[in-house]
Amino acid sequence: MFRGLVNAPYFTLLSDTSELGLCDISVEGKLIAGVFLRHGFKWGTLEGEKQGRIICAKGAHMIVENHALWGEEPTEEYPATFTYLGAEPLPDKPNGRRPAVIICGGGAFTHIALHEQDPVAFAFLDHGYQAFVLNYVTSDTGDVSFPHPQADLAKMVATVRANADEWHVDPKRVCVVGFSAGGMICASLATQWKTGPFAGLAGARPDDIRPDAVVLGYPLLDFAYVRDMQTRDPRIDLRVPKTGGKTGRDLLNDYLSMVTGDEATDEHLADICPTTHVSRQMPPTFVWGVSDDKTAPIAQVYPFAQRMAEEGVVCEMHVFDQGGHGLSLGNANTAVDNEDKQVAVRPWIRLAFRFLERHGF
């Protein structure tokens, strides 16, 4: 475990010396270099043994910890890790406890998009939350087939509650936030915390893994819908260069088999679709997406929202007119393509905070 202590939730890591530096930091020979401002976070790594300075504003202490999720160290079978970003107890709150947020970035289950992790965590930290960034299993690190990533999130929720005293967390206010593939993981837990296999896999009771609220950004919810949309493209049967003669259809089937652990039959795809399992046992859920998203089409989110409304789930949904996919906060620090198009989605986090506040956060 790496642990660092700095003097505020706003800090800058620089590779040069500074009169304002409070402490040095390096992790396993790599300097984590970054700039955090109120509206976002840019970061990278500098190779070598260089030391960096953490420059802080005055304020409450901030704690940064990196942990293996399933034991003392990550293993080949259980590779998931998480980072805890926390602040000191609130003196004016009962027991000084804060709400917790668990961040699940997207990345098509092959990796985790960094711009959907730390920037979002810091935004929630700025709003009074203790933040946890989950590095769930991906195809880069292990078996990504259902329900392994979902089990990681279930374990994360249970871990936050089990360590609520140490991390100054209110165990009755644990929110999960997911983007794209991470949104599917969060939606799966929200819909199947009681009926699915996740509690048993996490070694916990169902109540221990139930999130108290859910925020989903452009979630991937329905593999069958995405498959059907992609197979309508007439280019699907053309050979793709540098793939050993595989066609687009071959690659799509390979991907679906990777994430489903099956032959991707209609029945299996429906069974792992969160929409199939929507019930009134779901926690309050906030979901947003973009009408021009070609990767996780908004049309596959509408049935999910409709089912929630039919079941009486507390829910709120927002659809923005443009931005594409992978937007994160939609600001200059998280823009992955056309920043001008992403301006439209920036209000989502303010709307989400208001939703959460209305429901006990």
Where on the chain are the PLM-derived regions?
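N-terminal cap/lid segment of alpha/beta-hydrolase-fold proteins
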Residues: 59-95
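Catalytic nucleophile-loop/oxyanion-hole region of alpha/beta-hydrolase
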Residues: 112-114, 134-171, 342-344
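Short beta-strand/loop motif that positions the catalytic acidic residue
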Residues: 287-289
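Mobile cap/lid helix-loop segments that gate and shape the active-site cleft of serine hydrolases
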Residues: 225-277
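Primarily recognizes the serine-hydrolase "nucleophile elbow" in alpha/beta-hydrolase
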Residues: 158-233
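Conserved alpha/beta-hydrolase "acid-adjacent" motif
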Residues: 294-300
